[in-house]
């Protein structure tokens, strides 16, 4: 059987290509379809594809014309190498040159010849003459400090901020009614609110000891631990407010609660206030066994304390320390003793009975009312800490508070022992920057109470690592209204914020509500909560409704109301 062999299939065929004839020049007349829309960039085969770093080349002495011998190819980014790995953990470093102030420009312009050979104009050794040693001139030192984190103020992306915890856990059965952001609250204003009118006055005050005005850094005085009872009673537990609510007012609160609401736009930490609406009356209360009465420390600082709870410099331990200092200082600067004169109000202290034999702190209570318009009458309990005898014989009531220094290095503050006597304004300005909310609250409380003076004490630790021993370094006094102007505190805005919240609650039905500052956002939220929320019967052994009880850290403060 014969097979036919195809000889044409054994040899490759040759097809004549199409040759374009260019009459006006050389090269193809048309671009092939395979090369259309392909970007082209001049390149050289000697160029590296993405050179990362070169540690072998010597520094170029001719810095003015250092690029005159460089290749002109490869200047684009078509052949650059890009690493596709996630780089979100890297921190950006600002390499922009900081402009010098006018008094530093041209300082070393005419000193180039003084350094000599092998030296820079400032006298330092140049690196290109000494390859075996590493020298740091002024620019390198600045760059090194920038890499170490000195340039955070230029917008570097540092580590993520620590998330703060909420003062109370929001439950699923709570209904959110309103969110009020700080930019909107700052614009509120309620002007022409007259001073409050006294309804009742209770308690006994001791006179201020003027010898504490002569204390300075060189003549410091130890802070004593005074065993006295301080009552921090909420609104609905006050027997005087219960009596007055039957005849006077329709909004009831304490000065601490009002100050928290009025200064809410300066707060960073979370806080909450319980509001009960019964008919046309509103009662503002604080929750039991909470940290509402603790004083914050460096709340408005650029770098607030973030240590863990085991450290004495944690936010909570610093708050307990500041509260302990404030209570003891306000009682130590008074003239105590049975032989000393005392100022007594019309009624005795409403929180102690006649058969109780306890030593109570010097506190005077003023129950005042304010007309806020639209038939809203506010009744609040305000406090005085002491009284001062004037040469004319008229008493001046005082609000006595204490600022505390814990560790100036960790707090990015100024050394009180170095600046307090000579630059007290700088110390106060630093405190206004770090504790803006706390100072604003004290000022509002003094204005509401009608205090004639706001006395501030400067108390510091004996040792920065010892949070149990303190000394008094000095005192300073202000008039509350003048101090409010000095710290840019607008009482019209404070009354406007309070009136906004009152109007919002007045529109709701009868029940229990809660306003809370968001722990990480400048927002205040209003919640509608069940009537049995935060009832004392639901908690045992002093634990709050959120399951976490208030526990004291200091051994000398086993009682939350005892100092």
Curated annotation (Swiss-Prot):
Q: Which Pfam families match?
A: eIF-3_zeta
Question: Which InterPro entries does the record associate with it?
Answer: eIF3d
Q: Which GO terms describe its cellular component?
A: eukaryotic 43S preinitiation complex; eukaryotic 48S preinitiation complex; eukaryotic translation initiation factor 3 complex
Taxonomically, the superkingdom here is Eukaryota
Where's it found, cell-wise?
Answer: Cytoplasm
Is Metal-binding found in the keyword set?
Answer: no
Listed GO molecular functions? Answer: mRNA cap binding; translation initiation factor activity
Signal sequence region = none
GO-annotated biological processes: cap-dependent translational initiation; formation of cytoplasmic translation initiation complex; regulation of translational initiation
Q: Where is this region: Disordered?
A: 98-136
Q: Where are the residues of the annotated region RNA gate?
A: 291-305
Keywords assigned: Cytoplasm, Initiation factor, Protein biosynthesis, RNA-binding
Composition bias of kind Basic residues appears in 100-120
**Main localization, broad class:** cytoplasm
Task: State the protein's purpose.
Answer: mRNA cap-binding component of the eukaryotic translation initiation factor 3 (eIF-3) complex, which is involved in protein synthesis of a specialized repertoire of mRNAs and, together with other initiation factors, stimulates binding of mRNA and methionyl-tRNAi to the 40S ribosome. The eIF-3 complex specifically targets and initiates translation of a subset of mRNAs involved in cell proliferation. In the eIF-3 complex, eif3d specifically recognizes and binds the 7-methylguanosine cap of a subset of mRNAs.
Q: Which family does it belong to?
A: Belongs to the eIF-3 subunit D family.
Q: How does the record comment on the protein's domains?
A: The RNA gate region regulates mRNA cap recognition to prevent promiscuous mRNA-binding before assembly of eif3d into the full eukaryotic translation initiation factor 3 (eIF-3) complex.
> How does the record describe its quaternary structure?
Component of the eukaryotic translation initiation factor 3 (eIF-3) complex. The eIF-3 complex interacts with pix.
PANTHER family annotated for this entry?
EUKARYOTIC TRANSLATION INITIATION FACTOR 3 SUBUNIT 7, EUKARYOTIC TRANSLATION INITIATION FACTOR 3 SUBUNIT D
Q: What is this protein called?
A: Eukaryotic translation initiation factor 3 subunit D-1
Q: Which gene encodes it?
A: eIF3d1
């Amino acid at each position: 059987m014969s097979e036919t062999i195809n000889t044409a299939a054994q040899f490759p065929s040759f097809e004549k290509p199409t040759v374009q004839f260019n009459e006006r020049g050389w090269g193809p007349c048309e671009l092939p379809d395979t090369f259309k829309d392909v970007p082209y960039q001049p390149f050289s085969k000697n160029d590296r594809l993405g050179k990362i770093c070169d540690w072998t080349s010597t520094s170029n002495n001719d810095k003015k014309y250092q690029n005159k011998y460089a290749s002109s190819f490869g200047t684009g980014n078509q052949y650059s190498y890009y690493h596709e790995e996630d780089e979100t953990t890297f921190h950006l470093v600002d390499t922009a040159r900081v402009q010098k102030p006018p008094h530093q420009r041209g300082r070393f312009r005419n000193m180039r010849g003084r350094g000599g050979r092998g030296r820079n104009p400032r006298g330092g050794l140049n690196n290109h003459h000494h390859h075996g040693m590493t020298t740091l001139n002024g620019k390198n030192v600045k760059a090194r400090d920038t890499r170490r984190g000195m340039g955070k103020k230029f917008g570097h992306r540092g580590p993520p901020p620590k998330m703060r915890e909420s003062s109370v856990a929001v439950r699923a059965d709570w209904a959110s009614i309103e969110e009020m952001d700080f930019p909107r609250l700052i614009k509120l204003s309620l002007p022409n609110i007259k001073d409050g009118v006294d309804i009742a006055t209770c308690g006994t005050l001791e006179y201020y000891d003027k010898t504490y005005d002569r204390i300075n850094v060189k003549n410091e005085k130890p802070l004593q631990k005074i065993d006295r009872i301080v009552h921090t009673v909420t609104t609905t537990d006050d027997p005087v407010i219960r009596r007055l609510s039957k005849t006077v007012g329709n909004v009831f609160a304490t000065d601490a609660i009002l100050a928290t609401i009025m200064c809410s736009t300066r707060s960073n930490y979370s806080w909450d206030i319980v509001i009960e609406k019964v008919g046309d009356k509103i009662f503002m209360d604080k929750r039991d066994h909470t940290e509402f009465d603790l004083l914050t420390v460096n709340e408005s600082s650029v770098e607030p304390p973030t240590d863990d709870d085991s450290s004495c410099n944690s936010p909570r331990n610093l708050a307990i320390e500041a509260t302990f200092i404030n209570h003891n200082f306000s009682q130590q600067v008074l003239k105590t003793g049975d032989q000393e004169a005392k100022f007594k109000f019309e009624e005795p202290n409403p929180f102690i009975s006649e058969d109780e034999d306890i030593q109570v702190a010097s506190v005077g209570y003023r129950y005042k009312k304010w007309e806020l318009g639209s038939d809203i009458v506010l009744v609040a309990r305000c406090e005085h800490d002491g009284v001062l005898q004037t040469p004319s014989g008229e008493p001046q009531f005082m609000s006595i508070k204490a600022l505390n220094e814990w560790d100036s290095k960790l707090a990015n503050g100024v050394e009180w022992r170095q600046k307090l006597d000579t630059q007290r304004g700088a110390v106060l300005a630093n405190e206004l920057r770090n504790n803006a909310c706390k100072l604003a609250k004290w000022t509002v409380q003094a204005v509401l109470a009608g205090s004639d003076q706001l006395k501030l004490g400067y108390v510091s630790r004996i040792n920065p690592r010892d949070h149990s021993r303190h000394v008094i370094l000095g005192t300073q006094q202000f008039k509350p209204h003048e101090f409010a102007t000095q710290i840019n505190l607008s009482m019209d805005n404070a009354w406007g914020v309070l009136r906004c919240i009152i109007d919002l609650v007045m529109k709701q039905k009868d029940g229990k509500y809660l306003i809370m500052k968001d722990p990480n956002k400048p927002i205040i939220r209003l919640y509608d909560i069940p009537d049995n929320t935060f009832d004392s019967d639901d908690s045992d052994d002093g634990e709050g409704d959120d399951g976490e009880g208030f526990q004291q850290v200091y051994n000398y403060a086993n009682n939350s109301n005892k100092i």
